[in-house]
């Protein structure tokens, strides 16, 4: 386990946000200080979407295959488009590259039905520090 995860320096790490194009377009970083979701996104208006949380430890996503399968199964249950596992892995790898390897993190994949105006799914990945109190509960 990363011993540096609960250090004071780690608390200054800003979240990483990566926007995932559900049609396979470019993966792009998003400023975590700026809004991301539109007012008419189904995640906001109806809570319509799925998410999956992964542990990032030592610069890698843990149990990636298992999480990919569960994410796809959750999307299928809601009738959302099947997430492209390779594309989501690539987006996750890109997000992790911006995260310090010695700081444990949670990585959340989010896929929503999208905006009413476009009828196009919305998707993003966030990587953020695991709260110190959660790390302390593990010991």
Where are these regions (language model features)?
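Conserved alpha/beta cores of soluble small-molecule-handling proteins
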Residues: 1-139
């Amino acid at each position: 386990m990363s011993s540096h995860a609960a250090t004071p320096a780690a608390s200054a790490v800003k979240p990483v946000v990566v926007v995932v194009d559900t049609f396979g377009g470019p993966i792009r970083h998003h400023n975590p200080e700026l809004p991301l979701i539109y007012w008419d996104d189904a995640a906001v208006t109806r809570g319509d979407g799925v998410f999956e949380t992964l542990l990032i430890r030592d610069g890698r996503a843990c149990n990636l295959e298992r999480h990919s399968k569960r994410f796809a199964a959750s999307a299928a249950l809601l009738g959302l488009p099947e997430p492209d596992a390779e594309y989501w892995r690539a987006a996750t790898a890109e997000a992790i590259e911006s995260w310090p390897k010695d700081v444990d993190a949670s990585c959340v994949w989010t896929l929503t039905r999208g905006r009413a105006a476009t009828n196009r799914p919305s998707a993003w990945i966030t990587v953020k520090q695991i709260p110190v109190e959660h790390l302390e509960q593990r010991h």
